[in-house]
Amino acid sequence: GRDAYIADSENCTYTCALNPYCNDLCTKNGAKSGYCQWAGRYGNACWCIDLPDKVPIRISGSCR
């Protein structure tokens, strides 16, 4: 797995305010854990730890 901003099918990050929301989202997708990264590269977005390779992550390019 990898540590990354989890993305939806449109290459958009998940906006967040609280850590539990991201931890839940990340672990449901197979990650070890997750938290809300505040004021990061994509604003407030969920960051996952050890996310499986099959799950999409935010890559360069626009969020559609």
Curated annotation (Swiss-Prot):
Cellular component GO terms held in the UniProt record: extracellular region
Annotated GO MF terms: sodium channel inhibitor activity; toxin activity
Tissues expressing the protein: Expressed by the venom gland.
Disulfide bond positions: 12-63, 16-36, 22-46, 26-48
Record flagged with keyword Coiled coil: no
A single GO BP: defense response
Domain of life: Eukaryota
Ranges where the LCN-type CS-alpha/beta domain occurs: 2-64
Compartment(s) of residence: Secreted
Main location: secreted
Keyword NADP part of the UniProt annotation: no
Pfam families, per the entry: Toxin_3
UniProtKB keywords: Disulfide bond, Neurotoxin, Secreted, Toxin
Family designation: Belongs to the long (4 C-C) scorpion toxin superfamily. Sodium channel inhibitor family. Alpha subfamily.
Described function: This protein markedly relaxes the rat carbachol-precontracted anococcygeus muscle. This relaxation is inhibited by the inhibitor of nitric oxide (NO) synthase, N-nitro-L-arginine methyl ester (L-NAME), suggesting that the response induced by this protein is NO-mediated.
The record's note on its domains: Has the structural arrangement of an alpha-helix connected to antiparallel beta-sheets by disulfide bonds (CS-alpha/beta).
Protein known as: Makatoxin-1
